[in-house]
């Protein structure tokens, strides 16, 4: 589909942007014959990014670490889930009226539901962690939180560990011996992205 004056723009803001969102959403727009494009942007100031959204009439955007909590200061309305979680990752712009949603919890909920577990340990207590905690509460999964200042406890952990901190590639060794099972989190990312697409397109899946 050719970009024209009527093409809607969606984007994401992150301190460490990647290409996954661009690949996913642009393919979805094309497959559904929707006149829209998606672009990932680097940002170190979410307030300025929000101003750009309003100036350029960007229809919707995602935020990732470290903006999932701070973004709440710059929107006009919070969804019920965002009010409960205290963090957002998806924003809709309707004539410069911004409403915040959270789709992270949907991905976490659907993934955790397949595990059929009663307890887990969550690493980190940022925006994504808050969504995982919300999902755990809905599923009645008991959890404890390990924050960065408690990192010395990590090698002693047993059972299910849900890492909600940024992962950097390290080919030299392992922080934790993850046997017998590890999951990269790609399935959670896909689940939440599909939920974002529904919000961006008013229900199209």
Model-inferred region functions:
Residues 63-70, 128, 166-169, 180-181:
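Short glycine-rich anion-binding loops that position phosphate/pyrophosphate groups of nucleotides
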Residues 153-172:
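Rossmann-like NAD(P)-binding element
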Residues 9, 60, 119, 160-162, ...:
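Structural motif
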Residues 123, 138-155:
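NAD(P)-binding Rossmann-fold cofactor-contacting core
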Residues 176-205:
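Adenosine-phosphate binding glycine-rich loop
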């Amino acid at each position: 589909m050719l970009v024209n004056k009527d093409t809607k723009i969606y984007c994401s803001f992150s301190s460490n942007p990647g290409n996954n969102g661009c690949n996913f959403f642009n393919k979805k727009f094309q497959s559904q014959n929707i006149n829209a494009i998606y672009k990932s942007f680097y940002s170190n100031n979410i307030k300025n990014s929000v101003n750009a959204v309003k100036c350029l009439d960007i229809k919707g955007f995602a935020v990732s670490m470290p903006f999932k909590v701070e973004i709440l200061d710059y929107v006009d309305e919070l969804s019920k889930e965002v009010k409960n979680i205290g963090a957002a990752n998806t924003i809709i712009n309707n004539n410069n009226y911004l409403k915040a949603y959270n789709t992270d919890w949907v991905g976490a909920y659907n993934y955790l539901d397949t595990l059929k577990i009663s307890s887990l340990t969550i690493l980190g207590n940022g925006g994504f962690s808050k969504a995982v905690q919300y999902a755990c509460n809905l599923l009645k999964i008991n959890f404890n939180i390990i924050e960065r200042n408690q990192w010395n406890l990590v090698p002693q952990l047993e059972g299910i560990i849900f890492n909600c901190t940024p992962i950097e590639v390290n080919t030299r060794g392992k922080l934790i011996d993850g046997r017998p099972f590890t999951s990269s989190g790609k399935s959670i990312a896909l689940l939440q992205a599909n939920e974002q697409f529904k919000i961006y397109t008013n229900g199209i899946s």
